[in-house]
């Protein structure tokens, strides 16, 4: 395929081949820092803090491509607006892409590319951090000691060593999480539609999901969000979980039915819950809402529990991961502009 874009002149860098005009949605200062470092002036990157939706699609008028993040909405109607404005490529700067209507994108001739790999260690390690913080009540101890309260009542945890850990999804992240938990001396069970030979070689035992839930002291979710996995953790599956188990979700918020989860927490069925994602996080996560009432009663209720720890989709957020995400995004833009596909093309 011939190169799609003529060269443009960028003042401080001279003429660059296949330069694209790109609008980067949902950006913060750190996004700009890392993307600019990766870009090296090759493409014209314009930034907006706005998230993509039907109203903000007009901002992309006249752009060759848009760069999106997990909470940007690229529905069929939004994609039609983008296509009308000249957009022919979406650079998704994440692994997940359930926010993009791929069928509509293909129909409209919009190529979509993602970051298929960055640092699986970042997410796996954050899942462990959530677990350990919950189990040893670190968040509660931190708040106490800041007020010079050094009492231990209410801070008792459990040994992780000897626990049974259920890993739901054994891709790169799930496999690394399993390795870490084996290092703690845990027995690791797994569920996935495809068994990973690496996990089998490690001694991980694959079992049906119901068996995993019933046997595990800790359940950690590492699967993508598809119609088949939506609300896979629901009233029935929560009831099957071992009493006083921990549930960790660093994958996608839609995997968990939040209303059912609240009932399981209120009943005392779960020892604790660590969430880095939330089904209705769009418009809330990545934003400072500290000066206004929380607009989501379900999220507010979850945060109010002393044995629930919520972080704002930060599991991926390490220097190494953001560097790789930025470099891969720029490579995707450059390959598309030069008429090439790569392993990240959806």
What positions do the PLM features span?
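Short acidic/histidine-rich motifs immediately flanking catalytic phosphotransfer sites
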Residues: 60-65, 85-87, 214-219, 242-245
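Short, Lys/Arg-enriched N-terminal segments with co-localized hydrophobic residues
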Residues: 5-19
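An N-terminal-biased, well-structured beta-alpha scaffold segment characteristic
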Residues: 21-112, 234
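Phosphate-binding beta-alpha-beta segment of Rossmann-like dinucleotide-binding domains, i.e.
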Residues: 108-164, 176-179, 183
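Short glycine-/small-residue-rich Rossmann-like dinucleotide-binding loops
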Residues: 70-71, 217, 223-225, 251-252, ...
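Short beta->alpha connector loops at strand-helix junctions that form conserved
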Residues: 69, 93-94, 110-121, 210, ...
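Rossmann-like dinucleotide-binding domain for NAD(H)/NADP(H)
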Residues: 244, 252-346
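Rossmann-like dinucleotide/phosphate-binding beta-alpha-beta segment
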Residues: 153-243
